Regions:
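Proline-centered loop/turn at the N-terminus of a beta-strand
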Residues: 57-59, 139
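Catalytic-core regions built around general acid/base machinery
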Residues: 46-55
Length: 189
């Protein structure tokens, strides 16, 4: 059910609201437990160094709930390295949640940040989210996790048209961006 709603709506939460009339805030709290994750997670030195070296504003844009995103960032010692964290609770307008990959939400976020979408770079692990960003003219980088053998989690035919680049690590991202100048970096990991 979780995967089916994620594929159909872009976020499991939207399917749960649509079909089960759940309380979204209770759902987000109950479905994002932290203790097990935090036990496996520690400071991420390579990512810390990469974020320190990147030019431009760094904004986390995540479909995760606020309590979860902030706890993960603190535990990984990344919280002081980003200017802003935009969570799923912030992706609500006209009385409805509009998480990634909503093009309308991405436009709203750009307006809120006071930047043109063409000034933004979205670093993501979801091709669908990158596709929405490319429709607005954003630069895009697909993060491939180790062990995927080059296949993104949400691979679709023709995904190369929505990608500016692909990377496998924080160090590779830093090297790639060190040769480019980007006024705003939007990161999600």
């Amino acid at each position: 059910l979780r995967v089916a709603y994620w594929k159909r709506y872009g976020a499991t939460l939207l399917g749960m609201i649509e079909h089960h009339a759940i309380n979204p805030h209770a759902f987000l709290q109950d479905t994002h437990p932290l203790p097990d994750l935090l036990a496996k997670l520690g400071p991420h030195k390579a990512l810390q160094e990469s974020l320190r070296r990147l030019k431009g504003s760094k904004v986390i844009l995540t479909n995760a709930p606020r309590h979860y995103a902030h706890a993960v960032l603190r535990h990984a010692a990344l919280d002081a390295l980003v200017e802003q964290v935009i969570c799923i609770e912030d992706m609500c307008f006209a009385g409805r949640f509009r998480p990634k990959p909503s093009v309308a939400m991405l436009k709203m976020i750009c307006a809120r940040l006071g930047v043109s979408s063409r000034q933004c770079l979205l670093v993501e692990d979801s091709v669908e989210n990158l596709r929405a960003a490319r429709r607005l003219g954003m630069q895009t980088i697909l993060v491939l996790e180790h062990g995927w053998r080059g296949r993104p989690r949400s691979a679709h035919a023709g995904h190369a048209r929505v990608l500016t680049h692909q990377v496998h690590s924080a160090r590779q991202l830093t090297r790639l961006l060190s040769v480019r100048s980007s006024p705003a970096v939007k990161a999600e990991r």
